[in-house]
A protein has these predicted regions:
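N-terminal secretory signal peptides that target proteins for export/translocation
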Residues: 1-7
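Bacterial N-terminal signal peptides
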Residues: 9-20
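Copper-binding active sites and cupredoxin-like electron-transfer domains
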Residues: 24-372
């Protein structure tokens, strides 16, 4: 009897403490929609910005369509878009600081101890979607993953959101979701659709979650002591494994309907991207000498998505080590800091040779300090 009362007492105190924690935390609300888009991997076509000349014959494999059996540089895809409220009538402007996100969904930001409530509306035409976060704490009704897990009813409502429907996901940000002892004061996680993870992510439904230590977010929304933030996803989007493959073939390469297993056709649909752009088409990576710059690096994909981001001209700090190249595996997240001291326009790319040739390259710009 006494042991039972002690157990009940402990349970009640745990509930009280947990409830108090939730009441004291900040709840951050986001409204995201999954939408069909026509995406351009190379808006500069027919010019390669790397050298200012026409794309070479080898480069054209990935960017030149012929209305017959090559789709080209434009593909129908899906994308997460942020709205201002639950009416989903007004898109929230992204702002110049996030211009570089490209195909990625909006930044979802929180501090340790916060609660995130993210309402997802499916505005695609015929594709079930979801939201699944890496690193955060969630119950079964907010996992956003479609598989047989022994649940039913409301606990399955999050698994697959049908076109025209919506669902609100609730995620907690406990201490174990935030930066570790050797991390920077903010780190990055991924969120993505997980109904059919391979087809969903190749379609484009991916975005970043930025988590800061408790009390580290300044009024401007950035982590304290950080002037610029850049989020970059290195990923080989396999358009052969996208929900939109047949739509893209019908729209841009109708003769390829009978060639979907052709090796050359399949190779042409492997888009080696940084935030959904190839061959130096990624824009917005601009900073000034002396600024404190935080880079959030992500990777997702298959066994070919072994990436080694390399910054020319400047170095970075990773967990106390000085580096200019990182290692990324599919599904991993790395956060590093840079304080550039070398002005100029510098190459920033994956150092895997095959990926370089296929266009996984960009530039970042370091402006000189203004003289006083």
């Amino acid at each position: 009897m006494i042991a039972g009362l002690r157990c009940l007492s402990r349970c009640l105190w745990t509930l009280i403490l947990f409830t108090g924690h939730l009441q004291a935390s900040t709840t951050r609300t986001y409204y995201l929609a999954a939408e069909d888009v026509l995406w351009d991997y190379a808006p500069s076509y027919p010019v390669n910005p790397m050298h200012g000349k026409a794309f070479s014959e080898d480069e054209q494999i990935f960017v030149e369509g012929n209305k017959k059996d090559r789709i080209g540089h434009q593909y129908y895809k899906a994308r997460y878009v942020e709205y201002t409220d639950a009416s989903f009538t007004r898109i929230k402007p992204r702002g110049l600081e996030w211009e570089h996100l490209g195909l990625l969904g909006p930044v979802i930001r929180a501090e340790v101890g916060d609660t995130l409530k993210v309402t997802l509306k499916n505005k695609t035409r015929d594709m079930p979607v979801s939201l699944h976060p890496h690193g955060l704490f969630y119950l079964k009704n907010s996992e956003g993953t479609h598989y047989e897990d022994g649940t039913s009813g409301k606990d399955k409502a999050d698994d697959a959101i049908a076109p025209g429907e919506s669902h609100t996901y609730t995620w907690q940000v406990p201490e174990r979701s935030g930066p570790g002892p050797r991390d920077t004061d903010s780190i990055v996680w991924l969120y993505h659709s997980h109904v059919d993870e391979v087809r969903d992510t190749n379609a484009g439904l991916i975005g970043p979650i930025l988590i800061s230590r408790k009390g580290q977010l300044a009024r401007n929304g950035k982590p304290r002591g950080v002037d610029k933030e850049f989020v970059v996803l290195f990923s080989v989007f396999d358009e052969n494994e996208s929900h939109y493959l047949e739509k893209n073939i019908n729209a841009f390469a109708p003769e390829a309907l009978s060639q979907q297993q052709d090796d050359e056709f399949r190779e042409s649909n492997l888009m080696h991207t940084m935030n959904g752009y190839v061959y130096h088409n990624l824009k917005g990576l601009t900073m000034t000498v002396g600024e404190r710059v935080r880079w959030y690096q992500l990777a997702l994909g298959t066994e070919v998505d072994l990436h080694t981001p390399h910054w020319h001209g400047n170095t970075l700090e990773e967990s106390g080590r000085r580096v200019d190249v990182l290692n990324l595996l599919p599904g991993t997240h790395v956060t590093v800091d840079m304080q550039p001291d070398n002005p100029g326009q510098w190459m920033y790319h994956c150092h895997v040779n095959d990926h370089i040739r296929a266009g996984m390259m960009a530039n970042y710009t370091v402006l000189p300090q203004k003289s006083r």
